[in-house]
Curated annotation (Swiss-Prot):
Cellular location(s): Periplasm
Role this protein plays: Binds putrescine and cadaverine.
Family named by the database record: Belongs to the bacterial solute-binding protein 1 family.
InterPro entries the record matches: SBP (IPR006059), Sperm_putr-bd (IPR001188)
Coiled-coil intervals: none
Gene Ontology CC terms, in alphabetical order: periplasmic space
Protein name per UniProt: Putrescine/cadaverine-binding protein
Gene Ontology MF term list: polyamine binding
Keywords for this protein: Periplasm, Signal, Transport
Domain of life (superkingdom): Bacteria
C-alpha cells in the first residue's frame, strides 16, 4: 500500500512539473496577436500561452534592463532587436527547427539590424502615422495626410486639446524630423534642436503624450487626431464602426514620409522552454496564422504565404500595404548609441518639464 501511495505521489508530482513546464511566456505589444490564433496554438501544443504587455519600445527595454525575466518569446521592433543582440540577451536561432521559415518574404529578411537573421524573424510591420476623426477634420478642412496636423500651430489652433502624440522620444522626434525634411534617423545635434523647438511650439495644443489609450480615445470621439501605429488606427476605425458612432475614424500616412516598424520574434536567453518557443515561432510562420494578425488587427505582413488569406479590402489600404513610391518614404528606426541616447533623453526631459 505504501509503495502504491509513493508511486501515485511521484506521478502526481511529475504531472505537476510537466504542467508547469508547458507554459509559454510571451512579452508582446498590447493587442498584438489575434485571440483565435492564441487559442488555436494552445490547443495544438496542449500548453498555456501567458502574455505580458508593453506599449512602447522604451517601456519594454526598461523592464528588461530592470531585471524582468522569465520570458520565452519577445516581439521587439527592429531597433530593439539591434540593442538586445548587442547586450547578448537573445538566443541564436536554430533555423532547422522552423519548417515554415520559407514563408517569409525575402524583402523583409537579412536587414542591417540582424544580418542573416541569426536572432530574429519578422512577425509583422506597422507604420507610425496619423489617425483622425474624419467627420470633424472634414468640417474644418484639415488635411490629415500631412505632419502639419501634429506640428503646425496654425493648424493645431483649430483642434486644440483634441490631439495626442506618442510618449516615445524616438518616434516623436522621428516624425518631427520627417516634417522638417530630414531623415527620421538623423542624429545631427542641430537638427535635433530644431525638432525639439518644433515639438515645444506644438505641445500647448496637444491633449497628452499617449502611447497606450489613443485607440479608445479616438473611438469615443474624445480626441480627433492621434499620432500612433497603423494597426491601432485600424482597430480604432473598426471599433467606431462597430459601436455605431455618428462619426468616422480613419488614418493616413503623411506625405513627408513616416517611420516603418518591423516587429520580430526572438527567443530570450532566459527562456525556460525554448522548445515551446520554437513551436510558437513556427506556428506564427504558417501563412493562415500570420494572416489572422492582419485580418483581425490590421498589421502589414512579411509572410508571403499569408497574402492569399488576407481580406481583399485590407490589401487595398495604402497605410497597411504601401506601394513602392510610399515605401521609399518610410524608414525603420535605428538603435542609438549610448551618447546619442543620453542626448535625446536630455532633450525629451526638457520637453516634458516645460
Amino acid at each position: 500500500m505504501m509503495k502504491k501511495l509513493l508511486l501515485v505521489a511521484t506521478l502526481m508530482a511529475g504531472a505537476a512539473q510537466a504542467t508547469a513546464a508547458e507554459k509559454l511566456y510571451l512579452f508582446n505589444w498590447n493587442d498584438y496577436i489575434a485571440e483565435d490564433t492564441l487559442k488555436r496554438f494552445e490547443q495544438q501544443c496542449g500548453c498555456e500561452l501567458v502574455q505580458e504587455f508593453y506599449s512602447g519600445t522604451e517601456e519594454m527595454m526598461a523592464k528588461l534592463a530592470a531585471g524582468a525575466s522569465g520570458y520565452d518569446v519577445i516581439i521587439p521592433t527592429q531597433n530593439a532587436v539591434e540593442a538586445l543582440i548587442r547586450k547578448g540577451d537573445l538566443l541564436e536561432l536554430d533555423k532547422s527547427r522552423l519548417a515554415n521559415l520559407s514563408n517569409e518574404a525575402a524583402g523583409y529578411l537579412d536587414k542591417d539590424f540582424d544580418k542573416g537573421n541569426r536572432y530574429s524573424l519578422p512577425y509583422a510591420f506597422t507604420t507610425t502615422l496619423v489617425g483622425y476623426n474624419k467627420t470633424e477634420l472634414d468640417k474644418l478642412g484639415i488635411d490629415p495626410a500631412d505632419w502639419s496636423v501634429i506640428f503646425d500651430p496654425a493648424v493645431l489652433e483649430k483642434i486644440k486639446g483634441r490631439v495626442t502624440v506618442m510618449d516615445d522620444p524616438q518616434e516623436l522626434f522621428g516624425a518631427a524630423l520627417k516634417y522638417l525634411g530630414h531623415s527620421a534617423n538623423d542624429t545631427d545635434p542641430q537638427h535635433w534642436k530644431e525638432a525639439q523647438a518644433l515639438i515645444l511650439a506644438a505641445k500647448p495644443y496637444w491633449a497628452a503624450f499617449n502611447s497606450s489609450s489613443y485607440i479608445k480615445e479616438l473611438t469615443l470621439g474624445n480626441i480627433w487626431v492621434a499620432h500612433g501605429y497603423s494597426s491601432d488606427m485600424y482597430q480604432a476605425r473598426a471599433d467606431a464602426e462597430a459601436a455605431g458612432r455618428a462619426f468616422k475614424v480613419d488614418f493616413a500616412l503623411p506625405r513627408q514620409g513616416a517611420v516603418l516598424a518591423i516587429d520580430n520574434m526572438v527567443i530570450h536567453k532566459g527562456s525556460k522552454n525554448p522548445d515551446l518557443a520554437y513551436r510558437f515561432i513556427d506556428f506564427m510562420l504558417d501563412g493562415r496564422n500570420a494572416s489572422e494578425l492582419t485580418n483581425q488587427i490590421g498589421t502589414g505582413t512579411p509572410n508571403a504565404a499569408a497574402l492569399p488569406f488576407i481580406k481583399p479590402e485590407i490589401k487595398t489600404l495604402a497605410a497597411l500595404f504601401p506601394d513602392a513610391t510610399t515605401q521609399a518614404r518610410l524608414e525603420p528606426l535605428k538603435d542609438l548609441n549610448s551618447r546619442q541616447r543620453r542626448a535625446l533623453n536630455k532633450l525629451w526631459t526638457e520637453i516634458k518639464l516645460r
